[in-house]
Amino acid sequence: MSETATWQPSASIPNLLKRAAIMAEIRRFFADRGVLEVETPCMSQATVTDIHLFPFETRFVGPGHSQGINLYLMTSPEYHMKRLLAAGCGPVFQLCRSFRNEEMGRHHNPEFTMLEWYRPHYDMYRLMNEVDDLLQQVLDCQPAESLSYQQAFQRHLEIDPLSADKTQLREAAAKLDLSNIADTEEDRDTLLQLLFTMGVEPHIGKEKPTFIYHFPASQASLAQISTEDHRVAERFEVYYKGIELANGFHELTDAREQQQRFEQDNRKRAARGLPQQPIDQNLLDALAAGLPDCSGVALGIDRLVMLALGAESLADVIAFTVDRA
């Protein structure tokens, strides 16, 4: 397509028709399983504290708010969906727009479509099985394989990520010619993420989707810490053909612990010169009121459709990428 014809969609019309069919198939998948489709706000007065996520910010200046209200476009519908769960809605899913002020490229667009769903009374493994069912149905792929985070590092880097110190992690990075980055990095989790991205991801999910589970407890985010091994979190990610597709948790339900994690995130943000973010008190109040034991997962629809169609880029499956918006 001509670079000058920016009024035209980035994706072909046949691809958009196939995308619509996949969206309908996903809705049938959940309807058949009795999971309620919901809609939640795209904007909130609070946002994520995660140091790796960068939300878009806007300002409401309507009647009665002459001073204005800061609002953030949602990076995920997670917080609002958990409030619905605490209110007793039962299992829910959502197909929605999410926004992240970060990368743009083959696998990234600042505005993207997210599939997120939550299953009360599911543990992490049961939800992983359901994700696998969905992937097999949409992608017509083989059943997934599963590796713990520890097993993945031991297999591909010959190092134990749960016990290795920073010197050992830097030595592993040197074998990947990453010393220029690793030698000046003091944060252990950043070193682990560097090794995972460069030393593990290229080797997994080539022939079938691969679940990586039991991430280090320091990377728990909104997941519970394992009661069987306090070094790891009940968190998983899914990779297929070089693409990260999904990120799931056995959800943390303790409001006090969640608040402590948010505050710790903001301390890390301050140490890195990043703005501290407003904590979502409504979410904490919902957790305090009683979030049911549940597991949840977020899956990138644009990436899923890209894989299903054998496309080379998100631009091939999105009507208008940000450069044509």
From Swiss-Prot:
Catalytic activity: D-beta-lysine + L-lysyl-[protein] + ATP = N(6)-((3R)-3,6-diaminohexanoyl)-L-lysyl-[protein] + AMP + diphosphate + H(+)
Function: With EpmB is involved in the beta-lysylation step of the post-translational modification of translation elongation factor P (EF-P) on 'Lys-34'. Catalyzes the ATP-dependent activation of (R)-beta-lysine produced by EpmB, forming a lysyl-adenylate, from which the beta-lysyl moiety is then transferred to the epsilon-amino group of EF-P 'Lys-34'.
GO molecular function annotation: acid-ammonia (or amide) ligase activity; ATP binding; lysine-tRNA ligase activity; tRNA binding
Residues annotated for substrate binding in this entry: 76-78, 118, 251
Domain of life where this protein originates: Bacteria
Keywords of this entry: ATP-binding, Ligase, Nucleotide-binding
Xref: InterPro entries: Aa-tRNA-synt_II, aa-tRNA-synth_II, aa-tRNA-synth_II/BPL/LPL, EpmA, Lys-tRNA-synth_II_C
Family: Belongs to the class-II aminoacyl-tRNA synthetase family. EpmA subfamily.
Chain residues that bind ATP: 100-102, 109, 244-245, 300
Gene Ontology process terms (BP): lysyl-tRNA aminoacylation
Record-listed E.C. numbers: 6.3.2.-
Name assigned to this protein: Elongation factor P--(R)-beta-lysine ligase
GO CC annotation, single: cytosol
Summary of subunit composition and partner proteins: Homodimer.
